[in-house]
Swiss-Prot record:
EC number annotated for this UniProt entry: 3.2.1.17
Function (record text): Has antibacterial activity.
Protein family according to the UniProt entry: Belongs to the dictyostelium lysozyme family.
Name the UniProt record assigns to this protein: Lysozyme D
Primary gene name: alyD-1
Main EC class the enzyme belongs to: hydrolase
Lineage, highest ranks first: Eukaryota, Amoebozoa, Evosea, Eumycetozoa, Dictyostelia
Amino acid sequence: MRLLVTLILLIFVLTVSGQYSCSNPCYGNMCCSIPSNNEYYLTTFCDESTACGTPCSAQTYFTADSQRFGCGVTLTICSTSGGSTTTGGTGSAGTSTSSGSGSGSGSGSGSGSGSGSGTSGSSSSGSSSGSGSGSSSGSGGSSGSGSGSTMETGGFYGVCVKAITIDAGPNISVEEEAGMAIIDASSQICQDLFGSSSCGWSDKRSITAVQSSVEDGFPVNKPFNVTFEDYNKIISNSLILDQQCSNKNNCKYNKLELMK
């Protein structure tokens, strides 16, 4: 019985850990790769001694993960209840368009012939025969086209906050245990996005996190609501910042013209 329980636990651990694979392990015990869909679990921490030199008590909105983004980088973190995104493209919801057109034409021709004979009789007799042929042809055509469109804009996506990276981590073993990449952040972020003073990986509170700027037109030091259109703008800005960053390990994204 013990052997069976041990095997079940081993299979469970292997299944969970198999869900996450870091493509770029770094610094011996951390992961430097950024998920292609920008999705993470949110956890909370507060350390006075940090890799970037800024204590947690000096900031209200802060994160770790400097091994991924660099020290002092602004991140926009959003609850993902409204959707998800993938780096390399943007999508939108809350909008719809439709259009259509059609045309048709047809022609036809035909011919036929037939002959027959028959007899009937019991007390009388007779015969008859006949033949005939005919043909007909015709053609016709019709065409039409039409188009229409409908659009809805401004659909609510979710709640976001901006934060500054001040520390490295978490350990890659924690992410492997969680089965997903992790953003370790301040308790205020957990409170603003999920209404809780602390978040653990077992809570499975999903977020997206991307590089951003304090000058992109969105609020700082407080949570803010975003529409799908807003969120697509956030993602577009993050791509611009990433493409123009010359030093991936220490990039503060503070010199760019962004979408506002």
